[in-house]
Amino acid sequence: KWLHGQWTDNAQDFWDDFTGDGLLEKETVSDSVGCEFAQFHNFSFLKRREKIGSIGAWEELQPGEERTFEFVITWYFPNRVKAWIEFDEDYEKFQRGEYGTVRNYYATKFTDAWDVAKYVYHNKERLESDSRKFADAMFHKTTLPYYVIDALTANITNLRSNLCFRLEDGTFAGFEGIRDYIGCGYGSVPHVWNYAQTVAFLFPDLEKTMRNVEFLRETDETGCMSTRMFSVFDQERYAMVPACDGELGSVVRVYRDFKNLGDVEFLKTIWPKVVLAMEYALKQWDLDGDDVLDGQQNTTYDIEFYGPNPMTDSIFLAALKCCEEMAEIVGDEEHHQLYADAYEKGSARADQMMFDGEYYIQVQKEIDKYKYQFGKGCLSDQLLGQFLAYMAGIGEILPKEHVKSAMESVFKYNYKTDFYHTDSVHRAYAINEKR
């Protein structure tokens, strides 16, 4: 245990002790008068709250002899704030103790950090073996090019950060991102998590809990899905315009998750709310009933698209195709035929309306009437629905040759070798020599 002290007393005492003989002794106790500032203000550097300690192990070695020292570092923070904490006002409420607490899932499995350490010790061989098998498959026994491996592994690491967590009832949840002390983008946002695939394919049982929340708890009687999952903390429903790509993407993810798990009961339980969500989509975003979306479509960009556009409409087509197949599995013949007809008509019409011979465009005659539209531009995200369709295993939702042409166009018009001559006042994800 380190000396508590003021200023850097703790580090100084540790360093003096350690550099003396390489061994760790009990902290030094001093009766010397400290800094008087502490009598006037609660300076953190004078009245420290944190407790610090060090662990050391030693052996006497002969010249050239080697010895391995293993340490098991575990932690146990059983409770978390029962609220989404993102903004300053949320953090201030937390500091005032206005929120309750809820247990983390691992608190239902272990009693303390020592219990966790014992589990690691007794299962070390299996845990190490499984971890190495995964690493070997990812890095050493694959034919994937390096840039694909880099993209995959860079995103997988998010799972072991504070970005996401699991609550005591088993529900998996997460932010859009994290800052150094709080989250950013709270609520397991469907139109953000829509594009993540890691959890679904590595831990499908966790991913399934997100679908249960989205449909069974956050989709109302009209079929409208909330854009943020506040129910996981028993907070009031988040009031905001629904996200077209998020809600329809969640429909696709239901089928993907069913295929990953083979859980028919999961599908049967969630199916009525899926039907409601699709009814809402057809009324809210397909205003003229031609199975091509043309209404006001809120998206993950935090803007709305107006009129037919390939980004949201490709997700809509993927949702229709998934629903056609799911309806057959659960024995809902009426909706099976409804979705089959809508998909067939919608796919043909969307391709006819939006494919310009090279890629898919937004169809909007009054393009200047609305801000932030891309019109005839080559949107890099134009085939997100096709991507989700592939992830759900339903193949092409648009003509294969047109999909190929559109993908080639995305690369042709959007790939840059550097950003020295690209002006942007928006969020900068790449500058100068980055690509």
Give residue ranges: language-model regions:
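Substrate-binding groove/exosite segments of carbohydrate-active enzymes
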Residues: 36-38, 44-58, 65, 69-76, ...
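Long, low-complexity segments enriched in small/aliphatic residues
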Residues: 412-413
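The feature captures the catalytic groove of carbohydrate-active enzymes
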Residues: 2-20, 25-42, 53-57, 68-120, ...
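Short, intrinsically disordered, charge-balanced linker/junction segments flanking boundaries
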Residues: 431-435
